[in-house]
Regions:
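Compact beta-sheet-dominated domain cores in extracellular/mature segments
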Residues: 21-126
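Sec/Tat signal peptide C-region and signal peptidase I cleavage site
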Residues: 5, 16-22
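Bacterial N-terminal signal peptides that target proteins for export
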Residues: 1-8
């Protein structure tokens, strides 16, 4: 019985540790070139009005540009960092730039947000 408990405890610890690891960015080829995508293959974007480590996309902006949310126990790496939004939620940033998806991208590989708002939104590129 104690061996089973020890095995279950070890497995729980391993699974908990792996869920807290850093977001691993994936890349995809689009009609506008290679870009970072989320787990669903949706294009990720950066916003020129954000400063390093700070998201200014709140309210209606955040409704149209959902943040790439990080778990409370997310662990950053050298390139992938965690930014705390004004609403207290955590989001991922690549090299200090907060990452977002775009509401009007409906299928994996869509790039409708690139160049939006007079060029203030950009596909996040490797």
């Amino acid at each position: 019985m104690s061996r089973t408990f020890a095995a279950v405890a070890a497995l729980t610890l391993i699974l908990t540790a792996s869920s807290a690891s850093a977001q691993m960015l994936k890349t995809a080829d689009t009609s506008k070139g290679k870009t970072f995508v989320d787990d669903k293959g949706m294009t990720l974007y950066t916003f020129d009005k954000d400063s390093a480590g700070k998201s200014v996309c709140n309210g209606p902006c955040a409704e149209n540009w959902p943040a790439l949310i990080a778990a409370d126990d997310a662990k950053p790496t050298a390139d992938m960092t965690v930014v705390v939004r004004d609403d207290g939620k955590k989001m991922w940033a690549y090299k200090g730039k907060p990452l977002y998806t775009f509401k009007k991208d409906v299928a994996a590989g869509d790039t409708n947000g690139d160049g939006f708002l007079n060029g203030a939104w950009h596909m996040a590129k490797p």
